[in-house]
Amino acid sequence: MKQITAIVKPFKLEEVREALAECGVTGLTVTEVKGFGRQKGHTELYRGAEYVVDFLPKVKVEVVVKSADVDHCVDAIVRAARTGKIGDGKIFVTAVERVVRIRTGELDDTAI
């Protein structure tokens, strides 16, 4: 099993969710986050004063899938989240050793 963590632009969340649903993903976790990479930040004007905003709003989407489904899901996220502009985000894939569904006690693949 693998966990896919995608950091994407907030307005792309619905497209990413739909793309993952088409891959058979039935559940995901979404967290509002802030960060920066090569995009750095931007300046904003507030009450006549200009200031630098270092951290940009993003959303973190986390799903756990069977190892065989990783490439398909990652490709779907890339297609859904890509704008072609700087700041589109990143995807991280990590190994998951164990999953337990608390309600039923199901383990691993059956708990996903």
Predicted regions and their residues:
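Positively charged, small/polar-rich N-terminal and surface patches that mediate targeting and assembly
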Residues: 1-112
